[in-house]
Amino acid sequence: MTTMSNLPAEVLEEILSRTPVTSLRTMRSTCKKWNNLSKKKIIPEAARKQQGLMLIKKKICSLSFSLHEIHKDDYVVPCINQVDIPRNIEVEKIFHCDGILLCVIEDNCSLLVWNPYLGQTRRIEVSSDADMNDRYALGYDNNNSSHKILRIKKDFKNSDGLGYEIYRFASNSWSLLDEEVMKPEWDVWSVQRSSVSLKGNTYFLLQGNDYDDQEDEEEEDDEEYEDDDDVLPKDNFLLCFDYTTERFGPRLLLPFNPHVEETVALSCIGEERLVMLYQSFKTYKGIEIWVTDKIDPKAVSWSKFLKVDITPLTGFPVDFYADSFVIDEEKKVAAVFDIHCSYQKAHIIGEDGYLKCVNMGRASDVGNGQPLVFSSYVPSLVKVPVKQPKGKRKGRSSETKSNKNKKGRKIKIIG
């Protein structure tokens, strides 16, 4: 008699491949064979695919749909699943790095660090003066792989009105960062969702208005914008926070020169490369997507992935404004998320132009009418750093030990 535990490997792989990665923890506990297969087969394959996380009414949900069949006439059905978060906690904001999620919870007063695949969690209290506008980011020290959390808050005692704090998992403590060392000469309060953690560092996208409102100067700016691709308005750039040095790096050039009213969005491919979307209104109505060839805290280079002129496209919404997005490198297509006519939608574009629209449901049912924030996510075997007794330090580690006593274990909030 065939049972779940002795199914052929190809059948198991098919079942696991159709299971949301954030739900695999439950399936791993079914038997040792499923656990090993999910590690050796599913995690490496998931790293090559674009998956996503989003917040729906303060709940974390996984989002996936195949872009491989978009050239066919079949209706593309998105798969949205609520992730089983411990204790049914409500989440205000979500960030991630290295497969680990950083969740802002309880009216922004606490943080939950969580690996959904391993089912490991750790709770961290915010040091003081928690505010809904505080900015957070997660990364790690590349020298010893120890994770850290960056917090940027209002602090009017400092010259720029901002305070910078770092939480070091190795010491279980928050500490203030030196204002003069940290001051990056930019208005961090203009940053909302425009940050991505990559290779242990966090990259912030900064946009500002560097143009005069007078008509003659606008025309001069337009001419420069059209004719010189190398000119960079000073308030449009990337800035990297390096968790190893605990400092901001120099300004990194964008591959285009956006005006303040144009749309720029930031995403990533796995844990290796940044992806940037630019929706132009000035010189032409179109969308460009760029991918990094090289990226580190002090240097970046770009290649154009896709360019689509949306003016002549049949069916493309007139009032379309790009927000979050995801790309499929193999098929050379992108899904760009937007709210249109009270519905949350994913617009699929490619080299052939506008391909199709995927209906994600009424906006009131997904985020209370707010733009759908899609965050590219790759699961990992990186453990959540446990709270260490004084005198002990422990860095980031993979799940290399045996899974002894893990079968059927309950989730515990540590720390």
Curated annotation (Swiss-Prot):
Spans annotated as Disordered: 209-229, 387-415
Top-level taxon of the source organism: Eukaryota
InterPro entries assigned: F-box-assoc_dom_typ1 (IPR006527), F-box-assoc_interact_dom (IPR017451), F-box-like_dom_sf (IPR036047), F-box_dom (IPR001810), SCF_F-box_component (IPR050796)
Protein name: F-box protein At3g13820
Residue spans of biased composition, Acidic residues class: 210-229
Every F-box domain range: 1-50
Pfam families for the chain: F-box, FBA_1
Biased composition (Basic residues): 403-415
Listed Gene3D superfamilies: 1.20.1280.50
